[in-house]
Amino acid sequence: MNKIKTFLATALVALASVSAHAAPADPAGFWTTPTIQGYGNIHYLPNGAFKPQPGHTYKVVFAMTQGTAQPDKVNPALDHVARTVNLYVAAGVPLGKLKFVAVAYGAATPLALDDAHYRSAYGVPNPNLPLIAELKKAGVTIAECGQAVAEHHFQYDWIDPDVTLALSALTTVTTLEQQGYALMPL
């Protein structure tokens, strides 16, 4: 019995030691959202390798398939699209040189529901809609896979008006890749 008590005491001391050495809080201004305000946190490295060139045009199709465990939180794939915009603009690439299309399907499908239908399904307002609106203002096309809408038994008119209803993610991704877009799975 004493061995068990000694082991448990040692384990508790070790756990306390680990939690005492937890990472410090980030200082103010450590993370920024220079273009898509409030979304897609970045910590810019001005001398980082593989920095985008301001004069180039960047064409990316984001394949958003991940869902979210918390329906009241922004979909992490959509937040990564915002992060990508923020990184390119922070590197000096003008928004007009970014040709970004983000297509949602699979577990990401619900992110494009209008607020009424998202509330009906999840009991909370759709937290993705403000970000979708900001991305659209920045020139990003948010698309929804029509086949995924059908698979989820959603109606097509339940999709938010800021979202483009695509025939499918399969055809969207391959069509855009044929047009020179780089695929970024999220």
Predicted regions and their residues:
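Bacterial N-terminal signal peptides that target proteins for export
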Residues: 1-8
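A cross-taxonomic marker for long C-terminal extensions/tails that follow the last structured domain
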Residues: 9, 13, 23-28, 32-37, ...
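N-terminal signal peptide c-region/cleavage motif recognized by signal peptidases
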Residues: 17-20
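Acidic/histidine-rich, surface-exposed loop or edge segments in extracytoplasmic proteins
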Residues: 53-71, 112-116
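Structural recognition of the beta-strand scaffold that forms the well-ordered cores
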Residues: 59-63, 100-104, 141-144
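Solvent-exposed, acidic/flexible segments
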Residues: 67-77, 125, 166
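Histidine-anchored nucleotide/phosphate-binding helix
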Residues: 74-93
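Acidic helix-start/capping segments at beta-turn-to-alpha-helix junctions
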Residues: 95-112
